[in-house]
């Protein structure tokens, strides 16, 4: 801490600061706003004390019309073998601004090789061999040419067909605030829909799709016609179940009659128990008309109520994952392995054939894949506060081989999983979506994120305290106000914010309560791929930085650019967080070009054409009647988005 050495250690209550070169000496001064006191002005004496002869350049812009300051312009310099860029955006909040001029520190370099300004109207001007240590003024009226653009050798790989191929569907999630029940839970769990499934449901050889509904919104089946358009079909059974919230779905032949039936997972975090949390199996009459199969004794499904998260279907088995126990975030919910008798009747065989799978964790997604090439499908499950869990099929049972597969030390907030051969060796690899690295919450093996779950101070309600490391110390993320709301008895111990200060969880919670608490850990938040070594183990590799900007809720693998190598499309975002954490909205969809060896590089938006905003929950590949390939994107509280993939040549 160099505050005292730099002269910035004056006591006060400050809520704003701005940098500005007030005396035009090339050193940025500091103005600090104080409550109930005059503003403080700190003169920067760096130039007075500079013995190394450092240099600067300040650029003032004069723009057109009302934009007199050239706001939005980009100023770039090349000097001393390095490049710098300043985008003129001086606003820093309500009625707040920094110095609107572009300031460049040049170090020992006394001349700028080139200075380029790109104005908001895309015109530009270039100056060369500019002397340092001065303020220069450039006017937009002197800009005479547009900047050179790099010609594109190929059109974008994706084009948005959403408006040209309209589908009469928009997910309409109801408003429910999970924090009202559990104020200390890390994030909402009530925005996990909509479900999405693709398949030929009426036997005409064309792909159709199912889009799930929210509470009080029925799901819908869309049949594709010969022109490649989609129309909704009447489904009375869906309307009867419109109270349920559809978070995942799968199309498969459940009853062995040759057509695709529909399994829909009920979830959300609003319902405590009862019928809205019962999964549903809808049987197909072969023409795309669905009727609900009964649950219970003699029915198609066993009766179970859960906050479901996913469905993974294989030939004989269904894995149904659960995310949370209502009002008890952090308690491991029950998940299910269901076995099909071949005629559409499923029984719960979890305890019999997959010991430990019932309490596998807070499940997000799962997939079936024969990862070791023995001809039998294995189950891989991902979720929050858990490693990638591997259940290997052995003699008709599923045995936990997580440690043997190499995933024991990879606990995260995993959000999605996709199996594909990413490096061309004939073995299935995994694409694993996670929280990403653009988060206030950090996690590593040395400094994991932790969740302490317990009835602290014995108030009769379960509470969750999330901690993360800062400067080598693990602190709760919740502030004094949030903790006092959940545990009012703390008020006498922490009457002021100063008294709460840098309190650790062991300072806040009694030792006996901490000993009894359930502690969950996460040590990696990076989205990754897991390459199959061929010996029953996987090797994790983080995806490129561009894939870490937001959580990845959906991914697709395929050769999207026609070079014969597997590429990836990823999408995500998540808004249901506290203001402190800040919503995750930095993903606009991403194409990752594969090199055929398991390496991936991000493709810029101009080349890919992808622009997928919003909270993506599922993506699926679909073939149109004319042979064109589409990506269908299901987004929370939004329309279905359709992205056409450029034909392969």
State each model region's role.
Residues 8-12, 188, 240-244, 300-306, ...:
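Short glycine-/Asp-/Thr-/Trp-enriched loop segments that recur within the blades
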Residues 38, 215-218, 268-272, 324-328, ...:
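Short glycine/acidic-enriched loop and turn motifs that connect beta-strands
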């Amino acid at each position: 801490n160099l505050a005292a050495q730099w002269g910035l250690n004056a006591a006060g209550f400050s809520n704003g600061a701005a940098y500005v070169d007030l005396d035009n000496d090339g050193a940025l001064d500091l103005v600090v706003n104080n409550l109930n006191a005059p503003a403080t002005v700190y003169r920067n004496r760096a130039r007075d004390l500079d013995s190394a002869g450092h240099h600067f350049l300040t650029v003032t812009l004069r723009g057109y019309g009302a934009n007199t300051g050239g706001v939005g312009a980009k100023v770039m310099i090349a000097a001393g073998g390095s490049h710098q860029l300043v985008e003129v955006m001086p606003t820093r909040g309500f009625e707040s601004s920094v110095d609107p001029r572009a300031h460049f520190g040049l170090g020992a370099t006394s001349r700028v090789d080139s200075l380029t300004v790109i104005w908001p109207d895309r015109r530009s001007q270039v100056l060369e061999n500019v002397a340092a240590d001065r303020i220069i003024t450039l006017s937009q009226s002197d800009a005479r040419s547009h900047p050179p653009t790099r010609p594109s050798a190929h059109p974008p790989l994706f084009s948005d067909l959403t408006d040209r191929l309209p589908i009469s569907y928009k997910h309409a999630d109801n408003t429910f605030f999970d924090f009202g029940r559990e104020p200390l839970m890390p994030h909402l769990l009530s925005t996990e829909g909509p479900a999405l499934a693709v398949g030929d449901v009426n036997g005409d050889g064309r792909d159709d799709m199912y889009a799930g509904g929210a509470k009080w919104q029925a799901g819908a089946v869309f049949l594709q016609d010969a022109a490649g358009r989609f129309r909704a079909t009447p489904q009375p059974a869906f309307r009867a179940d419109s109270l349920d919230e559809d978070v995942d779905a799968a199309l498969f032949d459940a009853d062995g009659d040759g057509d695709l039936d529909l399994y829909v997972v009920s979830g959300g975090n609003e319902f405590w128990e009862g019928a809205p949390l019962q999964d549903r199996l809808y049987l197909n009459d072969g023409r795309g008309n669905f009727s609900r199969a009964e649950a219970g004794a003699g029915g198609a499904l066993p009766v179970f109520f859960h906050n479901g998260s996913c469905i993974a279907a294989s030939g004989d088995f269904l894995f149904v994952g659960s995310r949370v126990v209502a009002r008890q975030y952090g308690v491991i919910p029950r998940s299910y392995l269901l076995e099909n008798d071949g005629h559409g009747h499923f029984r719960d065989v979890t305890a019999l054939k997959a010991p430990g799978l019932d309490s596998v964790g807070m499940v997000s997604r799962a997939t079936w894949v024969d990862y070791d090439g023995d001809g039998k499908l294995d189950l891989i499950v991902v979720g929050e506060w858990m490693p990638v869990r591997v259940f290997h099929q052995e003699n008709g049972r599923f045995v936990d081989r997580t440690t043997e597969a190499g995933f024991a030390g990879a606990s995260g907030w995993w959000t999605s999983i996709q199996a594909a051969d990413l490096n061309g060796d004939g073995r299935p690899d995994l694409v694993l979506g996670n929280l990403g690295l653009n988060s206030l919450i950090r996690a590593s093996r040395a400094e994991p994120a932790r969740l302490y779950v317990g009835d602290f101070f014995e108030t009769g309600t379960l509470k969750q305290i999330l901690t993360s490391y800062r400067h080598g110390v693990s602190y709760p993320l919740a502030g004094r106000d949030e903790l006092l709301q959940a545990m009012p008895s703390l008020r006498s111990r922490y009457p002021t914010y100063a008294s709460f200060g840098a309190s650790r969880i062991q300072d806040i919670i009694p030792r006996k309560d901490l000993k009894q608490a359930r502690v969950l850990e996460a040590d990696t938040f990076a989205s990754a791929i897991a390459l199959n070594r061929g010996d029953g183990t996987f090797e994790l590799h983080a995806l490129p930085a561009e894939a870490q900007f937001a959580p990845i809720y959906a991914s697709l693998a395929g050769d999207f650019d026609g070079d014969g190598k597997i590429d990836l499309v990823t999408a995500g975002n998540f808004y249901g967080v506290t203001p402190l954490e800040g919503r995750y909205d930095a993903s606009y969809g991403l194409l990752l070009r594969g090199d055929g060896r398991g390496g991936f590089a991000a493709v810029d938006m101009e080349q890919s054409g992808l622009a997928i905003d919003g909270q993506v929950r599922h993506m699926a590949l679909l073939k149109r009647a004319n042979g064109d390939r589409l990506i269908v994107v299901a987004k929370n509280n939004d329309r279905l988005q359709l992205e056409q993939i450029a034909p392969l040549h």
